Amino acid sequence: MSKIIGIDLGTTNSCVAVLEGGEPKVIPNPEGSRTTPSVVAFKNGERLVAKRQAITNPNTIISIKRHMGTDYKVEIEGKKYTPQEISAIILQYLKSYAEDYLGEPVTRAVITVPAYFNDAQRQATKDAGRIAGLQVERIINEPTAAALAYGLDKEEDQTILVYDLGGGTFDVSILELGDGVFEVKATAGDNHLGGDDFDQVIIDYLVEQFKQEHGIDLSKDKMALQRLKDAAEKAKKELSGVTQTQISLPFISANETGPLHIETTLTRAKFEELSAHLVERTMGPVRQALQDAGLTPADIDKVILVGGSTRIPAVQEAIKRELGKEPHKGVNPDEVVAIGAAIQGGVIAGEVKDVVLLDVTPLSLGIETMGGVFTKLIERNTTIPTSKSQIFTTAADNQTTVDIHVLQGERPMAADNKTLGRFQLTDIPPAPRGVPQIEVTFDIDANGIVHVRAKDLGTNKEQSITIKSSSGLSEEEIQRMIKEAEENAEADRKRKEAAELRNEADHLVFTTEKTLKEVEGKVDEAEVKKAREAKDALKAALEKNDIDDIRKKKEALQEIVQQLSVKLYEQAAKQAQAQQQTGAGDAAKKDDNVVDAEFEEVKDDNK
């Protein structure tokens, strides 16, 4: 059975890990990095993952995770792509280098999502996995995964708060750990708050400064904006270690007097002033989670930081102020989520024993009832998997159909919450209002995905749906995307093989030239000429870039070079033999002058 890999599919960076010999291990990408940028670019029909070329290539997609579970589509080279398809391209890349590392096909994965992801976003993530050719064994919340990674080897019982500030999402979860049980007590968050927003405040500041100074709005210039984004991200990272940084962007724009540049110093104090409202926004969910769990800051034993943005000093200071304790720095915030996902994979595969994970649903679930009211059936922070039923009735006399409008959220009115789906229960026997009894049952599985069924208790007629949001994909669409992804994977494989073949052919040309110099005058000139012609033919094929021709010419040259090498060795062996014979003759001549003598051992008895 294939290994189950753990994937942290992040807004800005992704990471993949696997359990090896009971130990979780992060798999580095082909460039040797332990995290991979969640960036997809298209160039002349070719898909490039993790190449940060947004400056030069307008067909570059970043932070697609922010659009998961929506009907957003991005048009590239005349084709529209859903967020699921773009995410699948990233997942395919992670899968491919995990396969190279493990030396076997990978078909199963545990993928993490922000704890505050709703049903549509979770379903979209699962679909992305399927499109990438992965059986998604479990969707697991990022803070829960981090807690798994942190707490696996901890003996004592403790209550931990996981503060997860990623590139585009923010979550807080409070868990109780003890005897291998990881129980989530409460979770809260904001799906539109992350490191990208901290970059944005620096960008806005630089744009405003430049506008005041030169009267030019850089936010209208796509290439300038991308350069600003890169500079802002770099400045943000540098300010985690130093108190001021230099932002230098030459030739960012031009006016009638000539080129214009940005040359400015950004201090940590200024950055903290610009981002203070964002840091404060993260404190709301922290307080909410504590309240929902019925705890005070004093009840928290450890604060675990997850996500690259938690390196920002102001963030760490705010946590310290709010919770009265130093955050724990013993985990790598970029890798801990993927490691936790790999551990959960090990739990599912039976490799990790005595670990029980009890997660919760982040948002309340219910249906719309008379007057547009949102009636909750499952409250937020209920442990999953779970099932809950409630009996409803008709609102009008002789009503024969009931519309079931399924929602997720916390607001009292249905219109203010997120619609997950609608379905109808039909053929209800006509009766006065309030007489029919309709039982609505909600099931939430371990992935946090919702299934709903409605049953008329009078006729036992039942109607059920697995929620498909308006942005959800139909089975036909998923199958089509899987097929396209496989075709692209095949095209990528062929491209990779072609690149490897060209490299091998180049190397063979180089070594042949070297060999020909060595054999000159040592083997028959006709053989050398034959090899030289074959080498030139391969060079010509390389210039034409005809893969089949390169393969043929390479094989032909390899054979000739092998024959040359054999002849060279034969020649060398003959020479060595001739030298040995000459040496043996000389030794025999020397032996003629040797006189044999007898000797006698004399014993000295006086000693």
Curated annotation (Swiss-Prot):
Q: Where is the composition biased (Acidic residues)?
A: 594-607
Classification via Gene3D superfamilies: 1.20.1270.10, 3.30.420.40, Actin, Chain A, domain 4, Substrate Binding Domain Of DNAk, Chain A, domain 1
A Pfam entry, by short name: HSP70
List all Low complexity biased stretches: 571-586
Give the induction note.
By stress conditions e.g. heat shock.
Q: Which UniProt keywords apply?
A: ATP-binding, Chaperone, Nucleotide-binding, Phosphoprotein, Stress response
Q: Member of which family?
A: Belongs to the heat shock protein 70 family.
The record's InterPro entries line, in alphabetical order, gives: ATPase_NBD (IPR043129), Chaperone_DnaK (IPR012725), Heat_shock_70_CS (IPR018181), HSP70_C_sf (IPR029048), HSP70_peptide-bd_sf (IPR029047), Hsp_70_fam (IPR013126)
> What name appears for this protein in its UniProt entry?
Chaperone protein DnaK
Name of encoding gene: dnaK
This chain's function reads:
Acts as a chaperone.
Region spans: Disordered: 571-607
